[in-house]
Each structure stands twice: as C-alpha cells, then as structure tokens.
C-alpha cells in the first residue's frame, strides 16, 4: 500500500492512498468460497490523536481512525466491485489519577455481492477481542466494544479488568454470532515500551 498524507496539525492528519493484495488457494480447493484472488482499492483515511502530556503509561487519551476504500476483486469465481470501511475509536475516562476507564471500539464492513473466505477481515487476540486465538475469527462485518477498568499501582505499573463484546457476520458460512471475552491483565512500562500480560 502507498499513502499520501496531509498534516493539519500535531493531532489531525488525512491520507489518500492505494492498496492491493492477493491470495492463493495453496490446496487448490477452488470452491465457491475459497479461491485465488487479487484486489485493489483507492483509500482515504482520517486520524485524530489527543495526547495526555506527561502520562508515559497512557500517552494517548483519545484516538479516532477512519478508513474507507473503493475498488474491486478479481477471482476464479467471479469479479466484484467492492467497498470497505474501517473505524477504530479509543478513549480514556479519568475518574481520578489512579482509576481509569478505557473504551475501545473496532468496526469493519466489506460490501460485496459475493465473498471468498481468504479475503474476509481477520480478528481475535490481544489486539482485538481477547479470549480468542490470534486472528482465528473472520467476517465481512465485525463490530466490537473492548473495555478495561485500569488501576494504576505506580507511574509505570497497572492492573486492569477485561470485558470485551463483539458481533460478526461471515456470509461464506452463513454465520452471525456474538462474542464475549472476560479476563484481567497487568501492564508494566519498560525501556522498550509497555509490556502487557493478559489472561482471558
């Protein structure tokens, strides 16, 4: 992918770009839902980040990231015009210096008249809905609300709860389902960044 960006200021920026990908059916199944394909999209993005000055543990107070693309996919099954939109929102609610409520929402939608499995959005794991194996889930529609109650033990250490909820649709398998992840975690600020240990 390639992007051309314009910086409004320290917090806001926009991009226009182009991205493409291809996938091969290495098992040569070539069913109605698994096939070699190539896609290409013209994309646009908006990004807003509000930083909390002096907070090295949670430097990003608010994040808004919007991305959309219009393009097409070519496969052995058929050719399709497609559109996608991706939205990620994050915000920290500071109850006081030691108690923080963290909200994060990830959302994805791919519009197409037909789908192949290997083009679907992959999710699950520590960077999306926790309690599931990394990228073990797939769908053309995915929406989630990821929450943490964070208690700061010191300037470089905190513990937190995990309550994650998600919904997805996989039209290749005619699946519509809800997901729930529960757990807890521990975060430690190191010289190399934030080390996070999670059980969910």
Summary of predicted features, one role per range:
Residues 34-38, 56-58, 77-81:
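Short, contiguous, pocket-lining structural segments
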Residues 50-52, 57-60, 71:
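Long, internal scaffold/assembly segments composed of regular secondary structure
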């Amino acid at each position: 992918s390639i992007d051309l960006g314009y910086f409004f200021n320290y917090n806001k920026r926009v991009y226009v770009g182009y991205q493409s990908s291809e996938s091969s059916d290495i098992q040569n199944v070539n069913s109605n839902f698994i096939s070699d394909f190539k896609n290409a999209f013209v994309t646009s993005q908006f990004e807003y980040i509000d930083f909390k000055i002096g907070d090295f543990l949670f430097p990003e107070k608010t994040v808004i990231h919007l991305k959309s693309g219009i393009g097409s996919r070519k496969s052995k099954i058929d050719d399709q015009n497609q559109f996608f939109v991706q939205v990620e929102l994050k915000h920290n609610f500071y109850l006081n210096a030691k108690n923080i409520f963290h909200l994060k929402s990830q959302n994805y939608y791919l519009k197409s008249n037909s789908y192949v499995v290997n083009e679907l959005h992959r999710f699950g794991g520590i960077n999306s809905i926790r309690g599931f194996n990394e990228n073990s889930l797939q769908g053309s529609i995915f929406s989630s609300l990821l929450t943490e109650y964070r208690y700061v033990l010191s300037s470089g250490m905190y513990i937190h709860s995990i309550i994650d909820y998600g919904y997805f649709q996989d039209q290749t398998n005619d699946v519509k389902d809800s997901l729930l992840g529960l757990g807890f975690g521990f975060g430690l600020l190191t010289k190399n960044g934030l080390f996070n240990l999670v059980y969910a």
